Amino acid sequence: MLEQPYLDLAKKVLDEGHFKPDRTHTGTYSIFGHQMRFDLSKGFPLLTTKKVPFGLIKSELLWFLHGDTNIRFLLQHRNHIWDEWAFEKWVKSDEYHGPDMTDFGHRSQKDPEFAAVYHEEMAKFDDRVLHDDAFAAKYGDLGLVYGSQWRAWHTSKGDTIDQLGDVIEQIKTHPYSRRLIVSAWNPEDVPTMALPPCHTLYQFYVNDGKLSLQLYQRSADIFLGVPFNIASYALLTHLVAHECGLEVGEFIHTFGDAHLYVNHLDQIKEQLSRTPRPAPTLQLNPDKHDIFDFDMKDIKLLNYDPYPAIKAPVAV
């Protein structure tokens, strides 16, 4: 089955992973250096052993492709993946006068009473981002995140580089170039970033009329994050191939630190007990070619029949 490389990775970390303390104080079992390969001609690699919300993956990738860095677009599509990063900026500001939100990530997981207050404040924050332009501009914008790095990389000269746009043009004109690379890792920015890029670099490769993509991911949350990452970069491969008139080849996923959080072990064991089902297929709007013009309705997933979702706490 198409998702078997993911299941093999999870089992390997369960069997061979080294225990490590981590930034979130949760603890992980990890391995260093691993690679998965997915043949995209055999289906779309959205996991079937648990339900993965493809709508969130679509809206997040479109957010990146548009070069957007403000969570308003995500909120308009009921996507809350990036809420906490913007909310943190708000509650640390001099303008915030609500309940104490210090260390809200950990406290909301351990204290049900605080969690209720936190969710109420987050709902108020999201509503203001959606309906107050000035507030959204100040507190909804995340700055140097993937959309900015891919589409408007800031140079030391004060201008910007559209890395992804430039690479797509190179694929069309020089498909066999070995420089078809988009990087999100800027050492100058890392010390001041809320979360340095986990997906640090990806490279395209053209052969026999097929487009492949390899991602290097420095840090990977195997249970919660990696299923999203696989589908997101597989979708990106499809979209770029679509614009460039190519078929899809492989998505190759290379990891640095690939880890399972201690509080995800029961969940991944439950997932590994399930037998994978046939992979779904992807359908793109044939009447659109510029991927930067795509919207939600232009991307459809067909024949997705997953097992139920498995809930797990997010390490923050």
Curated annotation (Swiss-Prot):
(6R)-5,10-methylene-5,6,7,8-tetrahydrofolate binds at D221, A315. Signal peptide: none annotated. GO terms for molecular function: thymidylate synthase activity. Transmembrane segments: none annotated. Keywords: Cytoplasm, Methyltransferase, Nucleotide biosynthesis, Transferase. It catalyses: dUMP + (6R)-5,10-methylene-5,6,7,8-tetrahydrofolate = 7,8-dihydrofolate + dTMP. Pathway: Pyrimidine metabolism; dTTP biosynthesis. GO terms for biological process: dTMP biosynthetic process; dTTP biosynthetic process; methylation. Its EC number is 2.1.1.45. It is found in: Cytoplasm. InterPro entries: Thymidate_synth/dCMP_Mease, Thymidate_synth/dCMP_Mease_dom, Thymidate_synth/dCMP_Mease_sf, Thymidylate_synthase, Thymidylate_synthase_AS. DUMP binds at R23, R178, R179, R218, S219, A220, D221, N229, H259, L260, Y261. Pfam families: Thymidylat_synt. The active site is at C198 (nucleophile). GO terms for cellular component: cytosol. Belongs to the thymidylate synthase family. Bacterial-type ThyA subfamily. PANTHER family: THYMIDYLATE SYNTHASE, THYMIDYLATE SYNTHASE 1. Homodimer. Catalyzes the reductive methylation of 2'-deoxyuridine-5'-monophosphate (dUMP) to 2'-deoxythymidine-5'-monophosphate (dTMP) while utilizing 5,10-methylenetetrahydrofolate (mTHF) as the methyl donor and reductant in the reaction, yielding dihydrofolate (DHF) as a by-product. This enzymatic reaction provides an intracellular de novo source of dTMP, an essential precursor for DNA biosynthesis. This is Thymidylate synthase.
